[in-house]
Design a protein with these regions (language model features):
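A structural motif corresponding to the C-terminal end of an alpha-helix
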Residues: 3-4, 61-72, 119-131, 172-180
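Generic, ordered loop/turn and secondary-structure boundary motif
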Residues: 18, 144-145, 173
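Amphipathic alpha-helical segments in well-structured domains
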Residues: 30, 53-56, 117, 162-166
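Aromatic/acidic polysaccharide-binding cleft in carbohydrate-active enzymes
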Residues: 75-164
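Carbohydrate-binding surface patches
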Residues: 179-188
Length: 188
Protein backbone atom coordinates (compact mmCIF):
# COMPACT_ATOMS: atom_id res chain seq x y z
CA UNK A 1 0.00 0.00 0.00
CA UNK A 2 2.98 2.31 0.55
CA UNK A 3 4.16 1.88 -3.04
CA UNK A 4 0.72 2.55 -4.55
CA UNK A 5 -1.30 4.64 -2.12
CA UNK A 6 -4.98 4.95 -2.88
CA UNK A 7 -4.95 2.08 -5.39
CA UNK A 8 -7.63 -0.59 -4.99
CA UNK A 9 -6.05 -4.03 -4.55
CA UNK A 10 -7.85 -7.22 -5.44
CA UNK A 11 -6.91 -10.77 -4.63
CA UNK A 12 -8.17 -14.20 -5.51
CA UNK A 13 -7.75 -16.39 -8.55
CA UNK A 14 -7.54 -15.62 -12.26
CA UNK A 15 -9.13 -19.03 -12.67
CA UNK A 16 -12.07 -20.68 -10.98
CA UNK A 17 -13.68 -20.96 -7.57
CA UNK A 18 -12.10 -24.40 -7.14
CA UNK A 19 -8.64 -22.85 -6.89
CA UNK A 20 -9.85 -20.08 -4.58
CA UNK A 21 -11.43 -22.74 -2.37
CA UNK A 22 -8.13 -24.65 -2.27
CA UNK A 23 -6.11 -21.55 -1.44
CA UNK A 24 -8.34 -18.84 0.05
CA UNK A 25 -7.00 -15.33 0.31
CA UNK A 26 -6.37 -14.00 3.82
CA UNK A 27 -9.12 -11.76 5.17
CA UNK A 28 -8.42 -8.07 5.48
CA UNK A 29 -5.53 -7.97 3.00
CA UNK A 30 -7.39 -7.07 -0.20
CA UNK A 31 -10.02 -4.49 -1.11
CA UNK A 32 -11.97 -7.13 -3.06
CA UNK A 33 -11.79 -10.85 -3.79
CA UNK A 34 -12.32 -12.36 -7.23
CA UNK A 35 -12.44 -15.55 -9.28
CA UNK A 36 -14.07 -16.55 -12.58
CA UNK A 37 -16.46 -19.28 -13.66
CA UNK A 38 -16.43 -21.40 -16.79
CA UNK A 39 -19.24 -23.84 -17.61
CA UNK A 40 -17.22 -26.16 -19.89
CA UNK A 41 -14.62 -27.49 -17.46
CA UNK A 42 -16.18 -30.95 -16.94
CA UNK A 43 -18.77 -31.29 -19.73
CA UNK A 44 -19.59 -29.24 -22.81
CA UNK A 45 -23.03 -30.42 -23.93
CA UNK A 46 -25.82 -27.83 -23.89
CA UNK A 47 -27.70 -29.24 -20.91
CA UNK A 48 -24.58 -29.53 -18.73
CA UNK A 49 -23.53 -25.97 -19.56
CA UNK A 50 -26.91 -24.57 -18.51
CA UNK A 51 -26.92 -26.79 -15.41
CA UNK A 52 -23.73 -25.07 -14.22
CA UNK A 53 -25.93 -22.09 -13.35
CA UNK A 54 -27.47 -24.26 -10.60
CA UNK A 55 -24.08 -24.49 -8.86
CA UNK A 56 -23.58 -20.73 -8.64
CA UNK A 57 -25.59 -20.05 -5.45
CA UNK A 58 -23.41 -22.56 -3.58
CA UNK A 59 -20.21 -21.18 -5.09
CA UNK A 60 -21.16 -17.61 -4.21
CA UNK A 61 -22.25 -18.53 -0.66
CA UNK A 62 -19.06 -20.52 -0.04
CA UNK A 63 -16.87 -17.69 -1.33
CA UNK A 64 -18.75 -15.16 0.77
CA UNK A 65 -18.27 -17.32 3.89
CA UNK A 66 -14.51 -17.43 3.23
CA UNK A 67 -14.08 -13.70 2.72
CA UNK A 68 -16.58 -12.15 5.09
CA UNK A 69 -17.62 -8.61 4.20
CA UNK A 70 -14.83 -8.00 1.68
CA UNK A 71 -16.37 -6.90 -1.65
CA UNK A 72 -16.85 -9.81 -4.04
CA UNK A 73 -16.15 -9.33 -7.76
CA UNK A 74 -16.69 -12.09 -10.32
CA UNK A 75 -13.94 -11.86 -12.91
CA UNK A 76 -14.44 -12.17 -16.69
CA UNK A 77 -16.66 -15.19 -17.23
CA UNK A 78 -18.14 -16.66 -20.39
CA UNK A 79 -18.63 -20.05 -21.98
CA UNK A 80 -15.09 -20.44 -23.44
CA UNK A 81 -12.10 -21.02 -21.16
CA UNK A 82 -9.64 -18.18 -20.64
CA UNK A 83 -7.02 -20.46 -19.12
CA UNK A 84 -6.53 -24.01 -17.99
CA UNK A 85 -5.31 -24.22 -14.40
CA UNK A 86 -5.13 -28.01 -14.78
CA UNK A 87 -2.83 -28.23 -17.80
CA UNK A 88 -0.45 -26.44 -20.11
CA UNK A 89 -3.12 -24.84 -22.30
CA UNK A 90 -6.78 -24.67 -23.16
CA UNK A 91 -8.09 -26.99 -25.87
CA UNK A 92 -8.26 -25.75 -29.44
CA UNK A 93 -11.64 -25.78 -31.16
CA UNK A 94 -11.19 -24.89 -34.83
CA UNK A 95 -14.19 -27.06 -35.76
CA UNK A 96 -16.66 -24.99 -33.68
CA UNK A 97 -17.61 -28.00 -31.56
CA UNK A 98 -18.74 -28.40 -27.98
CA UNK A 99 -15.39 -29.16 -26.37
CA UNK A 100 -14.37 -29.16 -22.69
CA UNK A 101 -11.84 -26.50 -21.68
CA UNK A 102 -11.87 -25.02 -25.21
CA UNK A 103 -10.53 -21.55 -25.93
CA UNK A 104 -13.47 -20.81 -28.24
CA UNK A 105 -17.07 -22.02 -28.15
CA UNK A 106 -19.57 -21.27 -30.94
CA UNK A 107 -22.38 -20.81 -28.42
CA UNK A 108 -20.68 -17.63 -27.19
CA UNK A 109 -21.82 -16.01 -30.45
CA UNK A 110 -25.47 -17.05 -30.13
CA UNK A 111 -28.61 -16.79 -28.06
CA UNK A 112 -27.30 -19.61 -25.86
CA UNK A 113 -24.57 -17.38 -24.40
CA UNK A 114 -27.01 -14.51 -24.02
CA UNK A 115 -29.28 -16.75 -21.91
CA UNK A 116 -26.37 -18.21 -19.94
CA UNK A 117 -24.93 -14.74 -19.26
CA UNK A 118 -28.27 -13.46 -18.03
CA UNK A 119 -28.56 -16.50 -15.75
CA UNK A 120 -25.08 -15.79 -14.40
CA UNK A 121 -25.94 -12.14 -13.77
CA UNK A 122 -29.18 -13.11 -12.02
CA UNK A 123 -27.37 -15.60 -9.78
CA UNK A 124 -24.70 -13.01 -8.98
CA UNK A 125 -27.35 -10.45 -8.05
CA UNK A 126 -29.13 -12.95 -5.80
CA UNK A 127 -25.77 -13.93 -4.32
CA UNK A 128 -24.97 -10.36 -3.35
CA UNK A 129 -21.87 -9.96 -5.52
CA UNK A 130 -20.58 -6.41 -5.75
CA UNK A 131 -19.45 -6.54 -9.40
CA UNK A 132 -19.35 -8.95 -12.32
CA UNK A 133 -17.57 -9.02 -15.66
CA UNK A 134 -19.22 -11.02 -18.41
CA UNK A 135 -16.89 -12.19 -21.14
CA UNK A 136 -14.98 -9.54 -23.06
CA UNK A 137 -15.56 -6.83 -25.64
CA UNK A 138 -14.11 -8.86 -28.53
CA UNK A 139 -12.42 -12.20 -29.05
CA UNK A 140 -13.55 -15.70 -28.10
CA UNK A 141 -15.53 -14.42 -25.09
CA UNK A 142 -16.54 -11.23 -26.83
CA UNK A 143 -19.88 -9.58 -27.48
CA UNK A 144 -18.77 -7.53 -30.52
CA UNK A 145 -17.97 -9.31 -33.80
CA UNK A 146 -14.45 -9.04 -35.17
CA UNK A 147 -12.88 -11.20 -37.87
CA UNK A 148 -10.92 -13.98 -36.17
CA UNK A 149 -8.50 -16.76 -37.05
CA UNK A 150 -11.35 -19.25 -36.54
CA UNK A 151 -14.56 -19.52 -38.55
CA UNK A 152 -17.59 -17.68 -37.19
CA UNK A 153 -20.48 -19.01 -39.29
CA UNK A 154 -23.22 -16.49 -40.05
CA UNK A 155 -21.07 -13.60 -38.77
CA UNK A 156 -18.18 -13.95 -41.23
CA UNK A 157 -19.33 -12.17 -44.36
CA UNK A 158 -22.56 -11.01 -42.74
CA UNK A 159 -23.75 -7.65 -41.54
CA UNK A 160 -24.03 -8.36 -37.82
CA UNK A 161 -21.82 -6.20 -35.63
CA UNK A 162 -22.65 -7.69 -32.23
CA UNK A 163 -23.55 -11.05 -30.74
CA UNK A 164 -26.80 -11.54 -28.78
CA UNK A 165 -24.98 -11.35 -25.42
CA UNK A 166 -24.17 -7.72 -26.28
CA UNK A 167 -27.85 -6.87 -25.82
CA UNK A 168 -27.89 -8.61 -22.43
CA UNK A 169 -24.90 -6.52 -21.32
CA UNK A 170 -26.46 -3.33 -22.68
CA UNK A 171 -29.70 -4.06 -20.83
CA UNK A 172 -27.88 -4.85 -17.58
CA UNK A 173 -25.80 -1.68 -17.90
CA UNK A 174 -28.95 0.38 -18.41
CA UNK A 175 -30.38 -1.10 -15.19
CA UNK A 176 -27.25 -0.47 -13.13
CA UNK A 177 -28.19 0.69 -9.66
CA UNK A 178 -31.83 -0.35 -10.03
CA UNK A 179 -33.58 -2.34 -7.34
CA UNK A 180 -33.57 -6.09 -7.93
CA UNK A 181 -36.97 -7.77 -8.13
CA UNK A 182 -37.15 -11.47 -7.25
CA UNK A 183 -39.57 -13.59 -9.23
CA UNK A 184 -40.31 -17.31 -9.02
CA UNK A 185 -41.99 -19.82 -11.27
CA UNK A 186 -44.72 -22.10 -10.00
CA UNK A 187 -43.17 -24.89 -12.09
CA UNK A 188 -40.66 -25.88 -9.42
Amino acid sequence: RRAFPGVTRGGGMLSYFTELNRKPVPRGVFDFVTHTVCPIVHAADDISVMETLESLPSIFASTRSMMGKTPYHLGPSGIPCRDNPYGAAVAGNSENGRVCLADMDPRQRGLFAAAWSLGLAAAAARGGLDAIALGAATGPQGVIYRKASYAQPWFDGGNAAVYPAYHVLAGLAAMSGAKRLDVASSNS
